[in-house]
Amino acid sequence: LSLGNELQYDFEFLSSLLNHVKEKDPRHLYTTTSFTFEKGHGDWPETNDDFFITQWTRKGWVRGQGVFNTESPRFDKDYSASVEGMEVPLITHEIGQYAVYPDLKEIEKYIGILDPLNFKGVKEDLERKGLADKADDYLMATGKLAALLYKEEIERAMKTPGISGFQLLDLHDFPGQGTALVGLLNAFWESKGVTEAATFRQSCAPVTPLARSKAVYTTDEPFEADIEVVNYSDKTINNGIIGWKLADRHGKAIAQGEFPARSLPVGENSMTGSVRCPLDKITEAKELTLSATLKGTAYTNEWKIWVYPATLSVDKGNIVITDRFTVA
């Protein structure tokens, strides 16, 4: 239990209050606040916290907001450096918040006392600019990107041994405080059509296969990935076998295999095996899909991998390429 969300100001009082509720009802785990912007607090647990909820620590970010804009896409990163030395469980705070363009078809759903003036304003602006026919394209483009970011956000948390859980800001749009189109579902808890429940569940399930790999390769290097499984179900999985496949967009296998059976304990990240295969037979830029599945179950996950030729001949024609003005 938390005393509140993003509490600020008198932490001496909050600490005494936390001690009081612990004495009154010691059955639960308590924390002072679900994150805080208060100076001098919020980047490390308070003295009496049983667990810690935050966006960052004194060592760095623990959510993608401070990461994804500064590095190229890859699947082999986590937040271990930011949580090193943390002595209580850490939960990441209000992760996600990736905005999706308004679905203007939603306007007609408001038939009560609420009036979607924000959506109407966007629609009028598009109409003035002659872009009304692009609204669905904008929705899908931003929605697909948001879904990819949510996937990577959740998986990085799961890959980090020192992180015990995560909180999305919301799975659906929040209409109660300005415009917050942060959901993969709309304000009516309906799908926006940018992802499916089964797809989202691949990277957010009680048992989730995870991959540590680069996202971009050239044909002169081998594809490499470590496959692990996080088990947050209610029981140990005995003799779990992970099958994997690297395939092109038509489903044709570039390589595939499975790892030896092993136990997958509850509450742990279990390394199941490593994949290594050459890419030198690929002659043009390709999108590949790496998939990993716990055999005999519905638990599966997949990642898009991009492969480019190591060298590319360019027909320059009559164009002169030079770094000297006199030659130009």
Protein language model regions, located:
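Substrate-binding/catalytic cleft of secreted carbohydrate-active enzymes
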Residues: 1-173, 178-185
